[in-house]
């Protein structure tokens, strides 16, 4: 992939989700015992073979929204990822400079975003238990005073025609930022496809095992940080055993491990089960996703707008566009296009009820007592750019997050979202998203 192009959805069949879940259970119970880093250099063999064959997770009948105009669609690689460890070469140059609290990115040629929000004083999250709703559902903010652990995943897909240039740099840059903000190298695990240690390559199994390490023995007020930079996509949402759907747009979001062709993608339902449902009340998870279609990739049901209010599914904009199309067709005498536009409007109104039901079901099933926050690079129907900033390849979302937090670490949830949007709006159409496992006060201080 070349700078400025989206990290697009791959085509082709994907693995059966029930088989993926089974594979997760097997990997999860292998047990890591000691810190992941202590086993890091012992080598970790790849799974003996791929999971059972293809199944119910086929490609959607209609493709998810494509890339912005002028950007190419990326096909799946023609062959499996390189199997020889020698082919995983390190980048030719070092990542950009250190990210301290008051430092800016790069070599001094970067733009200074002097009009950033976030200069005010923000209250830290309350330490007592919170509740909401008629059933008084309990949750708790984390004060992030406990252990700090981080899992950073960057996949360039080296040697394939789907190759990206920024993810490995993103991981190195986020690591530098975390080290400057209270995290220890002993509690940071990196999976990148330039590694020579087999266990550190971002295969599907290695990613799932590393997630297990991240959440293992989590306690209230711990601070966990998860960063993924790579390809993302969508697949058709499947109902649960009761026939209920939890995606208001009809699609689940996925991320693509290095070995996705043989072992499949990782679906948002599984990410939520492993990283959100397993955490105790008051444990913090900050997840940063720099990938396409990543708006709800962690299935957190409370998504916030740049006004600090909850977003609800709204397909009425599509209906308005359809009516405009029909009116223009009527004016030009194009009867067939007019009827087509009106048909789309009817379908949109029918979908609104389905979307609202899925959104409500997601809140019922995916609300969690832990303190999970997701910062994602774009909406579910958007692509996320692999770009170049100050002469260095980077993911646009990773760059925006690090730029905001490095120039002014005093941010609220809302100001962080607004500032990231402002940085990206100058060059990209993608819109960063903020979502949470429980309702949040977006004017509280963002801590991690």
From Swiss-Prot:
GO biological process: apoptotic process; proteolysis
EC number of the protein: 3.4.22.-
GO molecular function: cysteine-type endopeptidase activity
Alphabetical list of SUPFAM superfamilies matching this protein: Caspase-like (SSF52129)
Domain of life per record: Eukaryota
Assigned keywords, A-Z: Apoptosis, Hydrolase, Protease, Thiol protease, Zymogen
Bias (Pro residues) ranges: 61-70
Catalytic residues (positions): 231, 292
Positions of the UniProt region annotated as Disordered: 1-129
Family: Belongs to the peptidase C14B family.
PANTHER family in the cross-refs: METACASPASE-1, METACASPASE-4
Biological function: Involved in cell death (apoptosis).
Designated name of the protein: Metacaspase-1
Organism: Candida albicans (strain SC5314 / ATCC MYA-2876) (Yeast)
